[in-house]
């Protein structure tokens, strides 16, 4: 992604204040989806699928901690740091761009849902991809950050499904 690419991709959003507001709302709503779906998964697994509960309680947090350490070690700059752009989404600080923790977390949560309710699981993985697009358009992630975050989230989630 170049500054020119970013300008071209975001021009329609910049020209329409409601579209920019929708981007902000989508970022917030899709992020909150993960905060809602993981605890709900744990409650429902407690009630109906105890083996899934223990896998989700172990694999997801361990994967998240390992993932966070990987991000901190790589400490890649964000697009607004490396390019001369005005990001549509505000974020304090810099670095730790690669891979996207939002894409990773939501795709991992979606994969955890598959054994309990596949439609919710797949819808959540799709929501993770959509959140990735929102964060790229927001100027706070590179496309590769999102792609790797999704791939690693799905891969770690497979450990819950197996």
Which residues fall in each region the model found?
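N-terminal transmembrane-helix/juxtamembrane module of multi-pass inner/ER membrane proteins
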Residues: 1-38, 51, 67-95
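Structural signal for the C-terminal ends of transmembrane alpha-helices
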Residues: 18, 43-50, 116, 162
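Transmembrane helix-loop junctions in multipass membrane proteins, especially transporters and channels
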Residues: 47-50, 75-80, 139-144, 161
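Hydrophobic alpha-helical transmembrane segments of polytopic
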Residues: 27-30, 56, 60, 124-127
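Interfacial segments of alpha-helical transmembrane regions
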Residues: 41-66
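Alpha-helical transmembrane segments of integral membrane proteins
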Residues: 37, 51-59, 120-123, 144-148
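Membrane-embedded catalytic cores of phosphoryl/pyrophosphoryl-handling enzymes
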Residues: 84-162
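Alpha-helical membrane-inserting segments
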Residues: 42, 62, 66, 70, ...
């Amino acid at each position: 992604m170049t500054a020119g690419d970013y300008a071209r991709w975001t021009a329609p959003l910049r020209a329409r204040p409601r579209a920019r507001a929708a981007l902000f709302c989508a970022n917030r709503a899709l992020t909150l989806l993960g905060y809602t779906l993981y605890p709900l998964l744990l409650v429902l697994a407690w009630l109906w699928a105890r083996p899934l509960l223990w896998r989700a309680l172990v694999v997801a947090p361990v994967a998240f901690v390992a993932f966070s350490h990987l991000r901190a070690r790589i400490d890649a700059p964000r697009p607004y740091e490396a390019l001369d752009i005005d990001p549509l989404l505000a974020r304090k600080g810099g670095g730790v761009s690669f891979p996207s923790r939002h894409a990773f977390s939501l795709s991992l949560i979606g994969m955890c849902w598959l054994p309990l309710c596949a439609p919710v699981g797949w819808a959540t993985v799709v929501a993770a991809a959509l959140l990735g697009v929102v964060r790229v358009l927001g100027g706070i992630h590179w496309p590769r950050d999102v792609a790797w975050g999704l791939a690693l989230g799905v891969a770690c989630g497979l450990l819950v499904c197996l």
